[in-house]
Amino acid sequence: MRIRVPALGEFEQVVLLAILRLGDRAYGVTMREEIRDCTNREPTPGALYTTLDRMEEKGLVRSRLGDPTPQRGGRAKRFFQVTAAGVEAVARAQRAYRQLLRGLKLPVVAHA
């Protein structure tokens, strides 16, 4: 059976890649840190969770609640995992970028 894979927005790609990099440690705080460290962008919790909820509805990620912890006032962490459809969506986006970059000569930009 073929998996229906929706097109990804740029931030959705970033979030999926952060989850894949973090593995079983992917929850809100660690994802925001990973995105910040890798992209120099600091997404707000609202932007991140809105995107995660939308991607869960699309079937790109699934979430589960961990155990409540005293450090979080008895609240549980919500962990995320990329589904097969999410992996395929990332792969499709990466293929599209490679195709667009093929043969393109980008100017060298010096970083200050």
Segments from the language model and where they lie:
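Short beta-strand/turn micro-motifs at beta-sheet edges
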Residues: 2-6, 67-69
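N-terminal helix-turn-helix DNA-binding core of bacterial DNA-binding proteins
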Residues: 5-47
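Alpha-helical residues within the helix-turn-helix
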Residues: 33, 56-57
